[in-house]
Regions:
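Extended aliphatic helical segments
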Residues: 4-5, 16, 67, 101
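Pseudouridine synthases involved in rRNA/tRNA modification
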Residues: 31-116
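A structural micro-motif recognizing beta-strand termini
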Residues: 18-21
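Short beta-strand segments
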Residues: 1, 14, 26, 72-78
Length: 116
């Protein structure tokens, strides 16, 4: 999994763009858990509720496929669900611009870290 930090709140929480390499089941969720940064709302890999900053009423998994890149095809883009937008606002995280995230997928040099 490759990732880029888009925005963060100190060391408590970050909004990241993730890019799977193999496409294995739960790859993104498992890798984020492995590096100590589980995805909020992930009841499978994030069972420790004492560190869960999810104080809002929304308990959905905070994982969204905003852009899917199919080899030799165009990028597919999906609108962010309302519950995800509400959570970003609640936590004070800034997506910046949709074009920012879109451009991450166009230039491989933007990806900073690879999780094995």
């Amino acid at each position: 999994t490759k990732y880029v930090v888009i925005d963060k709140i100190d060391k408590e929480m970050a909004l990241v763009a993730l890019s799977p390499i193999t496409g294995r089941t739960h790859q993104l969720r498992l890798h984020m858990h492995h590096i100590g940064s589980p995805i909020i709302g992930d009841k499978k890999y994030f069972k420790n509720n004492t560190n869960d900053l999810q104080n809002d009423k929304d308990k959905f998994l905070k994982l969204h496929a905003a852009i899917i890149k199919i080899p030799d095809e165009n990028l597919l883009k999906a609108h962010m669900p309302k519950h995800f937008k509400n959570s970003l606002e609640y936590y004070g995280l800034n997506l910046k611009k949709d074009e920012y995230v879109y451009n991450l997928f166009l230039e491989d040099k933007n990806w900073k870290l690879k999780i094995n």
